[in-house]
Amino acid sequence: MAKYSRLEVAAVMKETGMVPLFYHADIELGKKVLEACYKGGARLMEFTARGDFAFEVFSELNKYALRELPGMIMGVGSITDAAAASMFMQMGANFIVTPSLREDIALVCNRRKVLWSPGCGSLTEINRAEELGCEIIKLFPGSTYGPGFVKAIKGPQPWTSIMPTGGVSTDEGNLKGWFDAGVTCVGMGSQLIGKEVLANKDFDGLTKTVKDTLALIKSIKSVES
């Protein structure tokens, strides 16, 4: 079962401003990535369940995080149906991220008070997700919509919390554009945990990148406030 409630997870998303995304079939490599991100200050990790036996990999990574990385909140992304969401919640997923708005997933997550973040691409979808109890809207793909879309939504709906995924990088200008538009946090995958990092096993470099990116986000948010 989830260790953190949806409100606790949402609070950490807002506080840190970033959710790293990662998938790899190698459990030991996954542990190294988790540790590197944790050392860099990340306290959230979205494991994107895109490969065969991904549930086995997540189960081991979550056990590792619970045992060795206190405060690391593990969630699962790329979930497309309620059955998969339920299975990963049984393995301790603290949040569920989906590429589209699925009401069946909303129901199973809400029963357990687990945060779910559906991929939305219109104000109508965002409104429906919030009616279903969504705390954090995933804007996907972020590269298609851009900061201008976020700013337009936040005008009439300043209460809406948005997390763009896709089209987000560690570049200062990119991050400033998103946070100036009013996002709550950003999801970052290959731009943060790149193929070269994994191929070269440059975990110290990953720790530095995570640390620098979180510091940059904190700086941008402090100027806004």
What are these regions (language model features)?
Residues 1-83, 87-91, 200-223:
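Conserved N-terminal beta1-alpha1 strand-loop-helix module at the mouth
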Residues 17-22, 45-47, 74-77, 96-97, ...:
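Hydrophobic faces of well-ordered beta-strands that scaffold small-molecule active sites
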Residues 36-37, 61, 88, 109, ...:
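Generic structural signal for hydrophobic
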Residues 95, 99-145:
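Histidine/lysine/aspartate-rich catalytic loop segments that bind and position anionic ligands
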Residues 43, 95-105, 139-147, 182-203:
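Glycine-rich phosphate-binding active-site loops on the catalytic face of alpha/beta enzymes
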Residues 81-91, 124-132, 169-186:
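Catalytic cores of alpha/beta
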Residues 41-43, 68, 89-96, 111-117, ...:
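Glycine-enriched alpha-helix->loop->beta-strand junction motifs that scaffold or abut catalytic
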Residues 34, 58, 85, 106, ...:
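Generic hydrophobic/aromatic pocket-lining and core-packing "Φ" positions
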